[in-house]
Amino acid sequence: MKSINLFSIIGLVAILSLWFVSCEKDSDTEKPVINLIEPEEGDILQIGSDVHFEMELSDNVMLGSYKVEIHSNFDNHDHGTKADDAETAFFFERSWDVSGKKNADIHHHEIVIPENSIPGDYHLMVYCTDAAGNEAHVVCNVILSHEGGEDHDHDHEHED
């Protein structure tokens, strides 16, 4: 009799535990939002200069990190499928931590295009991952050139 009561109690606890776990809030499945402000589609980025990079990130729960990648688009590939590896004249990839925030206003000049970079069409890609691992990305077509580009005369102070 005691063993029947013990098994009944264990069974009841197991059922209640499963019910409690199944009633927890759904996990975060919403991707973060990327609003790339600078550079804009088709901008000319000057070789030998830094890039004025500005964007706004937001997430419904919590941001995690973002990554910027710049690579050549000499073969006019797209990012719908994996393209063959093309010779990359200039390549940049770096990640930044933005964890602990729901919103982040990003502004920096940490991307520098070396003097020996080959001019041409490039993809600037921004990836943002939230704390739950959901990822969003945007692609911006830019042109690297020895002439033209930004003069960096915009309304903010630079830190030395």
Feature names for model-found ranges:
Residues I10-G11, D78:
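Prokaryotic Sec-type signal peptides and long signal-anchor helices
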Residues L18-S22:
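C-terminal motif of bacterial Sec signal peptides marking the signal peptidase cleavage site
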Residues V13-S17:
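Alpha-helical transmembrane segments
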